C-alpha cells in the first residue's frame, strides 16, 4: 500500500520569527526560499492548487516570518522569508542571512530545499550562498526558474541549460528546472521532486496503516 500526497489539502499551521520558535524538529520538512519578487508565494499557491495558501505581497521583503504548512502527516513545507530586497534595512538582511544559515545547518527534519529564482535573473550572490550552504550540509536542492512564461520556448530551454551548467560547479545534488505559476510549466516536476523527498515518511505511514488493519478471521 502507498500513501499519495494530495497537495490541494496543504494547510497553514503557524508562523515563527525564527527557527527556535518552529514546532518540534521531527518528520520531513521541505524549505522554499528565494529572493523577494521571484514569485515564491504564487509558486506555492500553484503547487497546491490554492489561491491564497501563501499570501502574495505588494511590498516584497517585508514579511520576515517563517511560515509552516502541513502537506500530510509528518510532511511539511517551510516557507522562508524572501531575501535580497533593496528596501529591507541592512541589519535585517544580515539577520536573515544568519538565520537561513542556522536553519540549513541545524534543522534535522529538513530534507530538501527548493530555491526559486527569476529565470531572467538567476544565480545572484545570495542564491549561490544558499545553495553552497545546502550542499555543505548534504541537503538536496531543486532550483525552480520562475516566471518561465516570460521567455519563449527556445530562450527558456537555453537558460535552463545554462543554469544547470552553473549548478554543476556546486557539486552535491542540485537540479534545475523551469517553472511558471501562470502557465503551469514545471508544476508536475516540482510535485514529483517533493514526492521523492517525502517518500521515507510516506512509506512509514503506509507501513503503519497496514499494521493497523484488522486481521481477517479464520473462524469457520
Swiss-Prot record:
One of its GO terms (biological process) is division septum assembly. GO terms for cellular component: cytosol. PROSITE patterns: G_ENGB. InterPro entries: G_ENGB_dom (IPR030393), GTP-bd (IPR006073), GTP-bd_ribosome_bio_YsxC (IPR019987), P-loop_NTPase (IPR027417). Mg(2+) binds at residues 41, 63. Keywords: Cell cycle, Cell division, GTP-binding, Magnesium, Metal-binding, Nucleotide-binding, Septation. Its cofactor is Mg(2+). Residues 26-200 form the EngB-type G domain. GTP binds at residues 34-41, 61-65, 79-82, 146-149, 179-181. It holds the Pfam family MMR_HSR1. GO terms for molecular function: GTP binding; metal ion binding. Necessary for normal cell division and for the maintenance of normal septation. Belongs to the TRAFAC class TrmE-Era-EngA-EngB-Septin-like GTPase superfamily. EngB GTPase family. PANTHER family: ENGB-TYPE G DOMAIN-CONTAINING PROTEIN (PTHR11649:SF13), MSS1/TRME-RELATED GTP-BINDING PROTEIN (PTHR11649). This is Probable GTP-binding protein EngB.
Amino acid at each position: 500500500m502507498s500513501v499519495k500526497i494530495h497537495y490541494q489539502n496543504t494547510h497553514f499551521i503557524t508562523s515563527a520569527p525564527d527557527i527556535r520558535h518552529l514546532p518540534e524538529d521531527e518528520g520531513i520538512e521541505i524549505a522554499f526560499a528565494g529572493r523577494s519578487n521571484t514569485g515564491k508565494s504564487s509558486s506555492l499557491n500553484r503547487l497546491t492548487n490554492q489561491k491564497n495558501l501563501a499570501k502574495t505581497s505588494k511590498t516584497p521583503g517585508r514579511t520576515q516570518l517563517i511560515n509552516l504548512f502541513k502537506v500530510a502527516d509528518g510532511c511539511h513545507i517551510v516557507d522562508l522569508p524572501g531575501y535580497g530586497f533593496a528596501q529591507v534595512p541592512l541589519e535585517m538582511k544580515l539577520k536573515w542571512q544568519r538565520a537561513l544559515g542556522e536553519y540549513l545547518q541545524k534543522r534535522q527534519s529538513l530534507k530538501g530545499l527548493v530555491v526559486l529564482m527569476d529565470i531572467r535573473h538567476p544565480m545572484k550572490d545570495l542564491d549561490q550562498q544558499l545553495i553552497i550552504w545546502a550542499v555543505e550540509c548534504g541537503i538536496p536542492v531543486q532550483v525552480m526558474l520562475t516566471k518561465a512564461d516570460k521567455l519563449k520556448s527556445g530562450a527558456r530551454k537555453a537558460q535552463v541549460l545554462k543554469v544547470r551548467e552553473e549548478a554543476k560547479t556546486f557539486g552535491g545534488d542540485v537540479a534545475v528546472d523551469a517553472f511558471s505559476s501562470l502557465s503551469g510549466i514545471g508544476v508536475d516536476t516540482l510535485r514529483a521532486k517533493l514526492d521523492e523527498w517525502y517518500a521515507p515518511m510516506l512509506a512509514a505511514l503506509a507501513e503503519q496503516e497496514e499494521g493497523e488493519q484488522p486481521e481477517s478471521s479464520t473462524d469457520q
